[in-house]
Swiss-Prot record:
NCBIfam families, A to Z: alaS
Cofactor(s) this protein cannot do without: Zn(2+)
Name under which the protein is recorded: Alanine--tRNA ligase
Organism of origin: Bartonella bacilliformis
Main function: Catalyzes the attachment of alanine to tRNA(Ala) in a two-step reaction: alanine is first activated by ATP to form Ala-AMP and then transferred to the acceptor end of tRNA(Ala). Also edits incorrectly charged Ser-tRNA(Ala) and Gly-tRNA(Ala) via its editing domain.
Length: 886
């Protein structure tokens, strides 16, 4: 059968047989293009290769690239589920030539694959070429034998590809499949081209020009090829279906959601099942590549995708959490092709489960607030965009959910007002942000790399070396010399200074020549391995080509080494304690401390933290040798080395192994084995001691620990001991008894607070100390007891109101408590005999409006609310009593 997995492997095997390097998919977060939200095409990772900024050992490549289009310029989110071919996640099959073969081979490879390997009928295929690309048209006639009618010339930009306003560009040739005259639509270039009969399945881009400016375009001396074929589209063709969602992969996912929910994918429910299947793929792959749901950037797009799927699960009537239960089905279909899914399975499941649990609460709360804010609106009205933004910003209720909920009532959202509120918030955020100040563009570093070559790093073996200055940069410009007092950057042909990367900060130290001393404050790695020494000339003048001596601050480096090695031990300790779903999400290694971010869906208990710390320190006490090896990537992974999700590695990697396997079970020899380019201790004992000082949340599903090592850890613990002794002195007890003494004092305080609170309740019920409003009054024939009380906790107000209801027998009771920070909390009770005519929820909302609150909630007999303006408590009670007067 032409399954999705078979089609993918057939494509890659075909081009491998034809001399192409088969490369793994790049991460969904582009490595070298900050202008892109997500990788959305096969050529994204090769942009610098096409422009000449990067070079590889191969000049032919083929990939199955995972892509996401759900944010920024390329955004298919709103169409997904309602059309046959829109997806948030898709796979792009491609073959690439970097100044190797050109049009003839590209056309031959494509035609041969489609007609010989995939066995498509020639009669079902037609192609387009750019209107003046006579070469491509002639090659199609020669290779395929297609008639002139089936080689269509297109004059629009659809058949001319550009990377940007400038850069490589060239004409395209698109291959179309004819689904037959039973489906409406005409061939490309015709009046009916928007129909679904003729579907593009492959695009060949002939990069033969370079756009220098809007008016000037020149021929490239060595043209290249970039092609892209959507796997889902070609699968639909080869499986004889017209709709991408009818291919085997989607049929399996949709069948699973139908079975779990118990609702068939028909009628009004058809689109919802398709949305869930598509969004499951994008959510799982984004999480596996290190994206976590959040309220900004890529994390916000992921959250929108997840919540859109979860909303459709809600529309289908799913009573239980759904998305995480579909993960095993997805992995059974795609895990072999994408092993990162298998490695991240538990994390994907936990994040989906956590997010869907939160979303259900958000959905319930958001719909309640939305209904309250829109009760006065009628069909055809506009909902206030500022309020819609507040629902999003404060309560996490996305705009698309607000629009969907109101659309059923014929109400639109003022999107312009929403956008203005969003822009205002972003402007305020930008005003509070300051950049790095580095005005040198990446192009400068690549230019230096091309002129003088990469910097040779010597820092693994030594902290002192000699070299020659190859470049000097001052104020963003390449210069020939730098003078006394000037801040600048120095590039040397070789260096022992480590350039900041992999979370490890750059080295500092001294670069000196015959006529100058340069103090290095930081070292960065730019472009393609160009090491930049950043600092200031302290004496003399430095010139290009000067011979220099480079000396790293060894004391600082020693602390950094200890902290970096400690992160590896803590990483493995976390996995041993919490589970294999723990993977690194970020780190910061400085001489003062270390910070380690990792995937985990909940906070870590003190007992777990102690175990994590103890495990790591057990390896420190082993004082075992830390081993560094250069290995083939496949061998390293086979040995158990941990690779980071979202990272792309070369064929040869540096592997750091440390510690003996404590369990002495299985094939794993080492305690920790990771791919890493940082600097490390020689023996684990050099770390001295590891002490975790904090554990916090960074984002949904991401936790952070901070720790100290060696002398810093010892001094920290000494400080803790000193504080315990000082506290013991204040409490007049021994350090060993401090905890017991503090617990006794806390128990006594709680007892006194309870007695005080009980006394305040009694006073309130008896009419005292409540601003003279605690007596029972009669308003419009209704008994009323109410007042303003001080320092009664909001949670105790309900008990106070219940007591008041018993005291008056029939009527309304309302108490407002004002806290020390000026906030007001209110509870209103209505006795059972009056709930047919009076509603406590309506009454408490009158109080809430006066207190500056958002409304309230509860039952007809008991409701609560609050507000920030507790000073208006008396005014709020007056408003309530006025409402009872009628």
């Amino acid at each position: 059968m032409n399954s999705v997995n078979n089609i993918r492997s057939t494509f890659l095997d075909y081009f491998h047989r034809n001399g192409h390097e088969v490369l793994s998919s790049s991460p969904l977060v582009p490595r070298n293009d900050p202008t892109l939200m997500f990788t959305n095409a096969g050529m994204v990772d090769f942009k610098n290769v096409f422009t000449g900024l990067e070079k590889h050992s191969y000049n032919r490549a083929t990939t199955a690239q995972k892509c996401v289009r759900a944010g920024g310029k390329h955004n298919d989110l709103d169409n997904v589920g309602y059309t046959a071919r829109h997806h948030t996640f898709f796979e792009m099959l491609g073959n690439f030539s970097f100044s190797n073969y050109f049009k003839e081979e590209a056309i031959f490879y494509a035609w041969n694959l489609l007609t010989k390997e995939f066995c498509l009928s020639k009669d079902k295929l037609l192609v387009t070429v750019y209107h003046d690309d006579d070469v491509a048209a002639g090659l199609w006639r020669k290779i395929s034998g297609l008639s002139e009618e089936k080689i269509i010339r297109i004059a629009t930009n659809d058949n001319f590809w550009m990377m940007g306003d400038t850069g490589p560009c060239g004409p395209c040739s698109e291959i179309f499949y004819d689904h037959g005259d039973k489906i409406w639509g005409g061939p490309p270039g015709s009046a009916d081209e928007d129909g679904d009969r003729f579907i593009e399945i492959w695009n060949l881009v002939f990069m033969q020009y370079e756009q220098l400016s809007k008016e000037k375009r020149i021929e490239l001396p060595q043209p290249s090829i970039d092609t892209g074929m959507g796997l889902e589209r070609i699968a639909a063709v080869l499986q004889g279906v017209h709709d991408n969602y009818d291919i085997d992969l989607f049929r399996t996912l949709i069948h699973a959601s139908q079975e779990i929910i118990g609702v068939k994918a028909t009628g009004d429910f058809f689109a919802s099942h398709r949305v869930i299947a598509d969004h499951l793929r994008s959510s799982a792959f984004l999480i596996a590549d290190g994206i976590m749901p959040s309220n900004e950037g890529r994390g916000y797009v992921l959250r929108r995708i997840m919540r859109r799927a979860m909303r459709h699960a809600h529309l289908l009537g799913s009573k239980d959490l759904l998305m995480w239960r579909l993960v095993p089905v997805l992995i059974s279909e795609m895990g072999q092709a994408y092993p990162e899914l298998v490695r991240a399975e538990s994390l994907i499941s936990e994040i989906l489960k956590l997010e869907e649990t939160r979303f259900r609460k958000t959905l319930e709360r958001g719909l309640g607030l939305l209904n309250e804010a829109s009760t006065h609106l009628e069909e055809g009205d506009y909902f206030n965009g500022e309020v819609a933004f507040k629902l999003y910003d404060t309560y996490g209720f996305p705009l698309d959910l607000t629009q969907d909920a109101l659309r059923r009532r014929g109400i639109s959202v003022d999107v312009d007002a929403f956008d203005k509120a969003m822009k205002r918030q972003k402007a305020e955020a930008r005003a509070n942000w300051s950049g790095s100040g580095d005005c040198v563009t990446e192009t400068v570093w690549f230019s230096i790399r091309d002129q003088v070559g990469a910097t040779e790093f010597l820092g693994y073996e030594t902290e002192k070396a000699e070299g020659i200055i190859t470049a000097l940069i001052r104020d963003g410009e390449v210069v020939d010399h730098i003078d006394l007092g000037q801040k600048a950057m120095i590039v040397v042909n070789q260096t022992p200074f480590y350039g900041e990367s992999g979370g490890q900060v750059g080295d500092s130290g001294i670069i000196s020549g015959a006529n100058f001393i340069f103090e290095v404050h930081d070292t960065q790695k730019k472009g393609d391995n160009v090491f930049i020494h950043i600092g200031e000339i302290k004496t003399g003048q430095a010139k290009k080509h000067d011979c220099v001596e480079l000396i790293v601050d060894s004391a600082r480096r020693r602390k950094i080494r200890a902290n970096h090695s400690a992160t590896h031990l803590l990483h493995e300790s976390l996995r041993q304690t919490l589970g294999s779903h723990v993977v690194q999400k970020g780190s910061f290694v400085s001489p003062d401390r270390l910070r380690f971010d990792f995937s985990h869906p909940k906070s870590i208990s003190s007992e777990e933290l102690k175990k994590i710390e103890d495990l790591a320190n057990d390896i420190v006490l082993q004082n075992s040798k830390v081993t560094t090896r250069l290995m083939a990537i496949d061998d390293a992974i086979a040995e158990g080395a941990m690779a980071l999700f979202g990272e792309k590695y070369g064929d040869e990697v540096r592997v750091i192994s440390m510690g003996n396997n404590l369990e002495q079970t299985g094939s794993k020899k080492w305690w920790s084995i990771e791919l890493c380019g940082g600097t490390h201790v020689q023996r684990t004992g050099d770390i001295g001691l590891i002490h975790i000082i904090s554990e916090t949340s960074v984002a949904a599903g991401v936790r952070r620990i901070e720790a100290l090592t060696a002398t810093a850890a010892r001094l920290y613990l000494h400080g803790q001991d000193r504080r315990v002794y000082e506290i013991a002195g204040l409490l007049k007890t021994s350090p060993a008894d401090v905890q017991e003494r503090v617990q006794t004092l806390l128990d006594e305080r709680r007892k006194l607070e309870k007695e005080l609170n009980d006394s305040r309740k009694k006073i309130a019920l008896n009419g005292g100390s409540v601003n003279s409003q605690g007596d029972i009054q009669t308003i419009n024939g209704i008994s009323f007891m109410g007042g303003v009380v001080s320092n009664i906790l909001p949670k105790d107000l309900k008990a106070l109101v219940d007591s008041g209801k018993k005291k008056i027998g029939s009527g309304v009771v309302a108490f407002i408590s004002v806290s020390e920070d000026g906030k007001g909390s209110a509870v209103v009770g209505v006795t059972d005999d009056l709930t047919d005519t009076l509603n406590a929820v309506d009454l408490v909302r009158i109080i809430s409006v006066t207190l500056g609150g958002q409304g309230g909630g509860g039952r007809r007999d008991m409701a609560q609310a609050g507000g920030s303006e507790g000073g208006k408590a008396d005014e709020a009670l007056v408003a309530l009593k006025d409402s009872l007067k009628g």
